[in-house]
Curated annotation (Swiss-Prot):
Coiled coil: none
Sites where the protein binds substrate: R15, D16, S169, H198, Y289
Residues of the active site: H19
GO biological process, one term: catabolic process
InterPro entries: 2-IPM_HCS-like, 4OH_2_O-val_aldolase, Aldolase_TIM, DmpG_comm, DRE_TIM_HOA, PYR_CT
Positions that bind Mn(2+): D16, H198, H200
Enzymatic reactions: (S)-4-hydroxy-2-oxopentanoate = acetaldehyde + pyruvate
Broadest EC class assigned to this enzyme: lyase
GO molecular function, one term: 2-isopropylmalate synthase activity
Swiss-Prot/TrEMBL site (Transition state stabilizer) positions: R15
Name of protein: 4-hydroxy-2-oxovalerate aldolase
Entry annotated with the keyword Transcription regulation: no
Length: 342
């Protein structure tokens, strides 16, 4: 690639990283990591419960603090970085959206299953009305062909989204698929509508897929310092920044500082270092929503069925985010079937 490109990188460690610590970030940890990212030059940082605004619940897990407390702790301390919040319609509400805007959130990302963009109309419309940088976020994008994904992206654009993301929530995609789908969005949306890519590292393709997305026209790329995130983590931001420097892609992030943030700040906060184990590898191989990993491990402990087997079955059933309750059902069903055949 010879053309000089400028992209906007978006750190997920304080939102997607919530999944890997059971949503238990303290306010002090939030402040420490966000200010370190800010000082490293990261321009956009996401802060909410792992499942977005309103995720603090029995179904998705109670966080150590409310979304408001996290946002109010982080936003006033930012020197150059802006803060985003994620909202999944059906989990987060318009009241949650207004609260985030009142706290000073700059960017709101409205996430839906890739076939259900129509449920985002109200939230995208309100976000634009409030003057926020408004992003449509199409999850589990491997489940739709490029033309279907473009149709859904156009809906989000028509509701007012100024950027639409193609989201590899399962870490399932390979670079050629990313290139094809990002190209379809870039060619099919208005020139002024930006395209973004969000990857997971379950098949170790996060960086390669993100590079493919940039080459295909993506302007925004998500990553997570030290890969802090669900499953085997998100695209490791410090690695992606290094690759961008090698390729002449401008991010505005200081490579040395972001390496230090990963090593000295993020890693000590992890319950265990993010890595590709057999269960997270299965997420990518079977195309399963990355945040299902800890739920599947708990189901394994409860029912004696290996998490890997549960995840494969969830993939075969084409489960999506929001169907966390099915994990226990599937595990119980498999346990009973094995007992009956014993």
């Amino acid at each position: 690639m010879t053309d000089k490109k400028e992209i906007l990188v978006h750190d997920m460690s304080l939102r997607d990283g919530m999944h890997s610590v059971r949503h238990q970030f303290s306010l002090a940890q939030m402040i420490e990591l966000s200010t370190a990212l800010d000082e490293a030059g990261v321009p956009l940082i996401e802060v909410t419960h792992g499942d977005g605004l309103g995720g603090h619940s029995v179904n998705y897990g109670f966080a150590a603090h409310s979304d408001r407390e996290y946002l109010e702790a982080v936003i006033p301390r930012m020197q150059q970085a802006r803060v985003s919040a994620l909202l999944l319609p059906g989990i987060g509400t318009v009241d949650d959206l207004r609260m985030a805007a009142d706290c000073g959130v700059h960017c709101l990302r409205v996430a839906t299953q890739c076939t259900e963009a129509d449920v985002a109309e109200q939230h995208i419309g309100l976000s634009r009305k409030l003057g926020l940088d408004t992003v449509g976020f199409l999850m589990m994008a491997h489940m739709l062909p490029a033309e279907g994904l473009l149709e859904q992206a156009r809906l989000m654009e028509s509701y007012g989204a100024n950027c639409v993301y193609m989201t590899d929530s399962a870490g399932y995609m390979l670079p050629e698929e990313v290139r094809e789908k990002v190209s379809a969005l870039r060619e099919g949306l208005a020139d002024e509508t930006e395209v973004g890519f969000h990857g997971h590292h379950n098949l170790a393709m996060g960086v390669a897929n993100s590079v493919a997305a940039v080459e295909a026209g993506a302007k925004r790329i998500d990553g997570s310092v030290a890969g802090f995130g669900a499953g085997a983590g998100n695209t490791p931001l410090e690695v992606f920044i290094a690759v961008c420097e090698r390729m002449g892609i401008c991010t505005g992030v200081d490579l040395g500082r972001i390496q230090d943030v990963a090593e000295d700040v993020a890693l000590p906060m992890m319950d265990a270092p993010t890595r590709i184990d057999r269960d997270s590898l299965t997420l990518g191989y079977a195309g399963v929503y990355s945040s299902f990993l800890l739920h599947a491990k708990r189901a394994e402990a409860n029912h004696g069925v290996p998490a890997r087997d549960i995840l494969v079955e969830l993939g075969a059933r084409r489960t999506v985010g929001g169907q966390e309750d099915m994990i226990e059902d599937v595990a119980l069903e498999m346990s009973r079937a094995r007992s009956a055949s014993a």
